[in-house]
Amino acid sequence: QTTRITAIAIDLNGKSVATRQRTLPYRNNDAYYQRMNGIINDFAQELAKQGSTVRGVAFCMQGIVSADGQSITFGKIMNNTGLKLNELSHGLNYPSLMIHDSDASAMAELWFDHNLKDAVCIYLERRPRGAVIVDGSLYQGPNQCNGSIEHMTLIPGGNTCYCGQQGCMDTYCSPETLMEDGESLPGFFSVLEQGEQEHRERFSQWLDYVALAVTNIRSVLAVT
């Protein structure tokens, strides 16, 4: 499995000032993390040459982070359950922390919209995910897993999810479910725009599942 590492430098106003992307064959081991941190260190050094000071590094992870922020308590997607921050950051020259990627996205929403008070953020990416905002702040809950909407049961006894349960939202609302074997997502929408009936039906069914998920969320959390 090949992973894409995206390093983004954010200034204190929340503006992206530089980006670097690299691909690495993924392994949940020390060698992989050292190579990754080498990329980050090089990126930070280039920023320093341009007059910037790097204050720290946030690892945005597809996994549930422990309450103390020191380990991954549930990491099925990356197969890294139990990964500790000191292992992840080995060889890194800067202070660091771990955060669930959806929580990081929600914090960005708050940064750019100071009027945002109560909301559920829904991110329909390859692996759908969410985050909860209450009274203008990210609300992660005692186990740091508030907003894990992708694992609500949408269809009882339905498709098997990577988490081991059946019928999770992820298995019905992931954009991957729109594609047939060998089809790309842009390819799907290209055919959809041409009005092909089977693609229209598939997209309509997907929208129904997404709407059902939103309805379930709103029945629990009264947000607008």
How would you label these PLM feature ranges?
Residues 116-172:
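Glycine-rich phosphate-binding loop of actin/hexokinase-like ATP-binding domains
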Residues 12, 101, 124:
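Cofactor-binding loop segments of dinucleotide-utilizing enzymes, especially the Rossmann-like FAD-
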Residues 12-13, 67-68, 134-135, 156:
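Short, ordered coil/turn segments that flank beta-strands lining enzyme active or ligand-binding pockets
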